[in-house]
């Protein structure tokens, strides 16, 4: 298991180097790296039939796309903002575009036009479903969870299809839907609250998502494998952290 953590630390360092830009660093916060997504991309690409020399580039590339998407999400939609805030907003958009350009550059160097198409398709799907969540145009509970799953894991879905590794589609979706709901802001949780009329509380819905993610990890990954143990522990940590924060806020 120590080897996994060492590999992830190395990937994290290389990703930060790619994401580093001296001018942007002066004006906006460094992009946050989702270490759970880094872990799952590492595990997925470990199973892919690709050269060892290319594996690291694929992982970094996928995470650059994720960073670009996350950075664009940081852009404020407020109409009235101060001059300095407007500059930060413009630079945040620029940063997201810059990170997108990096992934195109890496894949073009590898001459992998098919992966460019794969990631572009995922980006299109993610943006479409972000709009659905933003304007609440989903029809029902299933529609809502489908959109959350696509926003959080479409990159994994498309990459898994590209390399014919179907189990990572369900596993990534179940895990990241749970994580997104646990880390959601008040507005996001209010959407969940609208489903209470179906006879479930927010807590029961979150518990169902936890069990679903845990079941996927236990049934789709080798028993007691390092990646299975790490993901089970992460699920528990995410759940415990949120419970702790709720208790603190409630006093």
Swiss-Prot record:
Keywords: Isoprene biosynthesis, Sporulation, Transferase. GO terms for molecular function: heptaprenyl diphosphate synthase activity; transferase activity, transferring alkyl or aryl (other than methyl) groups. Transmembrane segments: none annotated. It catalyses: 4 isopentenyl diphosphate + (2E,6E)-farnesyl diphosphate = all-trans-heptaprenyl diphosphate + 4 diphosphate. It is an enzyme of class 2 (transferase). InterPro entries: HEPPP_synth_su1 (IPR009920). One of its GO terms (biological process) is isoprenoid biosynthetic process. Pfam families: HEPPP_synt_1. Its EC number is 2.5.1.30. Supplies heptaprenyl diphosphate, the precursor for the side chain of the isoprenoid quinone menaquinone-7 (MQ-7). Heterodimer of component I and II. This is Heptaprenyl diphosphate synthase component 1. It comes from Bacillus subtilis (strain 168).
């Amino acid at each position: 298991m120590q080897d996994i953590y060492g590999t992830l630390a190395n990937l994290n360092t290389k990703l930060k180097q790619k994401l580093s830009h001296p001018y942007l660093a002066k004006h906006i916060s460094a992009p946050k790296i989702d270490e759970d997504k880094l872990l799952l991309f590492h595990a997925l690409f470990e199973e892919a039939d690709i050269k060892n020399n290319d594996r690291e580039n694929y992982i970094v590339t996928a995470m650059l796309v994720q960073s670009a998407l996350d950075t664009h999400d940081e852009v404020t939609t407020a109409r009235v903002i101060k001059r300095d805030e407007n500059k930060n907003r413009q630079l945040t958009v620029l940063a997201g575009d810059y990170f997108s350009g990096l992934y195109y550059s890496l894949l073009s160097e590898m001459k992998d036009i098919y992966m460019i198409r794969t990631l572009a398709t995922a980006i299109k799907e993610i943006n479409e479903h972000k709009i659905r969540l933003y304007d609440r145009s989903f029809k029902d509970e299933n529609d809502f969870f489908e959109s959350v799953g696509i926003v959080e894991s479409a990159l994994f879905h498309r990459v898994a299809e590209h390399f014919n590794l179907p189990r990572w589609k369900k596993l990534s979706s179940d895990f990241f839907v749970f994580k997104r709901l646990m880390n959601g802001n008040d507005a996001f949780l209010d959407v969940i609250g609208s489903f209470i009329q179906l006879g479930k509380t927010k807590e029961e819905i979150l518990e169902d998502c936890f069990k679903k993610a845990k079941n996927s990890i236990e049934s789709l990954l080798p028993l007691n494998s390092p990646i299975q143990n790490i993901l089970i522990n992460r699920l528990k940590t995410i759940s415990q952290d949120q419970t702790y924060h709720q208790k603190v806020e409630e006093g």
